[in-house]
Amino acid sequence: CLFNDILDLSEMESGTLEFVREKVNLYHACLEEYDRHRLKVNKGVILILDDVDEELCVMGDRMRIMQVLMNLLSNAAKFTPTGEIHFGYQLRGNIVQFYVKDTGIGIPANRVAKIFERFGKINNFAQGTGLGLTVSRMLVERMGGRIWVRSGEGIGTTFFFTLPLG
């Protein structure tokens, strides 16, 4: 929602956005996002929550982690007319690496570097505000992680983000 994105952006920039630090079971958070998105994908698209460690937890803000996942899954659904969207996470040392991988249209090479900027859209026809990835980047960074993308036009896109365990 445009209003929520603008509000979150404003609060992050002013330093007033509050984060709750709690133990978050990542499997339950991902399963909730799976349930939210599985009926929203286009006909001919399969949403898959990959095999993950069902016991893995991080100390973080559950709502903000889910907000990032929701933004990434919504974008994947928007730009995947047919095919698959996989998502999940893996433990890598003392960090957790999340991913959302689609077989969609991909991001043109000249747009990849700007995708996390405000109002960064992959094309002029894309629906949405162009703020979701900016907000996601800021949320991930405020939680001590980082976010990046790999994409090939016509072959799909994979977004990654990391969060520290503790």
Q: What does each model-found stretch correspond to?
A:
Residues 132, 136:
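Short alpha-helical Gxxx[C/S/T] motif in the catalytic ATP-binding
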